[in-house]
């Protein structure tokens, strides 16, 4: 029996909840993975997994064995890297998940420079706005915007981007400018679709906080589409500066109600809460943290 392979398949079976998913990762068949699990259970003399037609769950013994198996795989990976002299030479695949707009607009250049620096590393970038399960989906690093973070991940604050109300000068010439937050209801407000707060907008100015109702007929589920719509004169929007700083600098957009702003948007770097993290992933985390700190539209990471 290939013990290391069996342990790896068992660990991923617990994490993915599916032998078929493990087979796809291992580029083999589901019956092959089933045989590996059966052989491992015979070797140990205990049942590790409870199988049904709809689910796969570890038994109590399987849950305890899972933690030990993780440690064994960690030690094995470290020993192999040391034996091959690769402890200082990153190599292998890094799977990265990021919000679609941030990944498309800002992340590509950062990853390209990392690949140029480390020619033995491969990166798979998954752009998706949903909250992915890092372990189940085999993600090494995830970038998450906002304050909601998964409890089972290690989070590192990479930056904070202020959020300002902005509009194109052409729109403001046509419609005028709101003089106070409550007047936003009289203007075309472009917002992100599916927000929990709906048309409610929370703004602050120093110690003052106002909750205002906005009106708008256009809602978009992609930040770059909001950026384009605002630049085209479609209305007023509340945007993080990483998304629009260049347009503000060029004059394509201007601030509206400049004394007021929204809650700053935090950007975190996440990694699975396992003890072992490959060198390639650690280096990319550090690289991304440095690059994000230099992006236009990010400010002191402690201001949140």
State where each predicted segment sits:
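Short helix-loop hinge/linker segments at domain boundaries
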Residues: 53-56, 63, 74-97
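Flexible hinge/capping segments at coil-to-helix
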Residues: 152-163, 167-192
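Central regulatory/effector-binding core of bacterial HTH transcription factors
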Residues: 91-154, 301-304
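Conserved amphipathic alpha-helical core elements
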Residues: 22, 40-41, 253
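C-terminal effector-binding regulatory domain of bacterial HTH transcription factors
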Residues: 67, 120, 241-250, 260-304
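N-terminal short secondary-structure element
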Residues: 1-27, 65
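A short LG(V/I)-centered, amphipathic sequence patch enriched
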Residues: 41-58
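Hydrophobic hinge/microswitch elements
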Residues: 211-255, 262-264, 273, 282
């Amino acid at each position: 029996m290939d013990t290391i392979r069996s342990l790896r398949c068992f660990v991923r079976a617990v994490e993915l909840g599916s032998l078929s998913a493990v087979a796809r990762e291992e580029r083999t068949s589901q019956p092959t993975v089933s045989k590996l699990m059966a052989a491992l259970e015979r070797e140990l003399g205990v049942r590790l997994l409870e199988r049904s037609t709809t689910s796969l769950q570890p038994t109590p013994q399987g849950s305890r064995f899972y933690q030990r198996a993780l440690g064994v795989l960690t030690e094995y990976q470290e020993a192999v890297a040391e034996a091959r002299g690769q402890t200082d030479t990153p190599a292998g695949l890094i799977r990265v998940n990021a919000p679609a707009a941030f990944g498309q607009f800002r992340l590509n250049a950062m990853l390209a420079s990392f690949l140029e620096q480390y020619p033995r590393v491969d990166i798979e970038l998954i752009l998706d706005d949903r909250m992915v399960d890092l372990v189940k989906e085999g993600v090494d690093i995830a970038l998450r915007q906002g304050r909601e973070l998964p409890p089972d991940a290690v989070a590192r604050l990479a930056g904070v981007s202020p959020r300002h109300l902005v509009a194109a000068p052409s729109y403001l010439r046509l419609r005028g400018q709101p003089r106070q937050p409550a007047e936003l209801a009289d203007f075309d407000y472009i917002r992100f679709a599916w927000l929990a707060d709906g048309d409610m907008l929370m703004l602050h100015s120093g110690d003052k906080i106002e909750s205002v109702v906005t009106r708008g007929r256009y809602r978009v589920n992609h930040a770059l589409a909001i950026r384009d719509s605002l630049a085209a004169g479609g209305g007023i929007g509340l945007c993080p500066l990483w998304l629009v700083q260049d347009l503000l600098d060029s004059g394509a957009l201007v601030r509206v109600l400049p004394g007021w702003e929204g809650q700053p948007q935090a950007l975190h770097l996440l990694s699975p809460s396992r003890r072992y993290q490959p060198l390639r992933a650690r280096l990319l985390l550090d690289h991304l943290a440095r690059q994000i700190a230099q992006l236009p539209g990010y400010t002191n990471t402690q201001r949140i």
